[in-house]
């Protein structure tokens, strides 16, 4: 007769035997792709690098950047290997982005075309939640794409290339990136003192809001920005 304790022991032993097979960079990519927060944490806690690159024999986890002609025809596909952070940022999985960054993911990791996670977040329908978080963690605003159709484009340059000037989300995102750049370069005081900003109350309000919390301000004041940026900040956002 087999005792219950022996069955439990056998199951536990069998379970532990399977765990090493689950701990792999391939499964980290799968967890990130599915926005599996618990799975991502588990794999990172068990030693999988947040900077792993997926084996290049699987196109499923490669970055796909496509160029579509005016008539909607697909005319070119570019393929480069992503990191988990590229995938999380590209999909707007903010919690997973944060987990990866907190566990040592390289915030400015480059795929084979030179896309950083910020570039990936921008090109994928302007994932604002990912962009905000990447900015908070200090992602570069000056790194350029090194190959392909978008070669030489910084994050702002990429947004100019793919975004419509009439899209309020694009206008707000341009403002966010440009203002963040000015803020980092400590040039904000110079900008708000320019004479082309005529209304003192707007000048003070803008400065206070930007210094306090740029991303939240941009997200909650899209209509304000759309109106006043074009009127008062043509030197800052040059369409």
Curated annotation (Swiss-Prot):
Keywords: ANK repeat, Repeat. ANK repeats lie at residues 23-52, 80-109, 113-143. Coiled coil: none annotated. It comes from the Bacteria. InterPro entries: Ankyrin_rpt, Ankyrin_rpt-contain_sf. It holds the Pfam family Ank_2. SMART domains: ANK (SM00248). This is Putative ankyrin repeat protein RBE_0489. It comes from Rickettsia bellii (strain RML369-C).
């Amino acid at each position: 007769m087999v005792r219950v304790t022996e069955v439990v022991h056998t199951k536990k032993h069998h379970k532990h035997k399977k765990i090493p097979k689950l701990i792999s960079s391939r499964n980290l990519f799968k967890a990130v792709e599915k926005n599996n927060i618990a799975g991502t944490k588990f794999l990172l806690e068990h030693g999988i690098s947040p900077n792993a690159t997926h084996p290049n024999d699987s196109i499923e986890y490669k970055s796909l950047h496509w160029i579509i002609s005016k008539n909607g025809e697909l005319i070119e596909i570019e393929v480069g290997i992503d990191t988990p952070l590229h995938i999380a940022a590209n999909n707007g999985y903010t919690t997973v982005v944060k987990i990866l960054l907190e566990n040592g993911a390289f915030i400015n990791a480059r795929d084979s075309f030179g896309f950083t996670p910020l570039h990936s977040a921008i090109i994928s329908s302007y994932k604002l939640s990912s962009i905000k978080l990447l900015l908070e963690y200090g992602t570069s605003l000056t790194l350029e794409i090194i190959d392909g159709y978008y070669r030489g484009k910084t994050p702002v340059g990429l947004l100019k290339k793919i975004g419509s000037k009439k899209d309020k989300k694009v206008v707000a995102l341009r403002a966010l990136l440009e203002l963040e750049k000015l803020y980092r370069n400590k040039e904000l005081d110079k900008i708000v003192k320019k004479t082309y900003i005529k209304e003192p109350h707007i000048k003070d309000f803008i400065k206070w809001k930007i210094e306090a919390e740029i991303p939240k301000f941009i997200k909650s004041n899209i209509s304000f920005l759309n109106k006043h940026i074009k009127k008062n900040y043509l030197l800052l956002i040059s369409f």
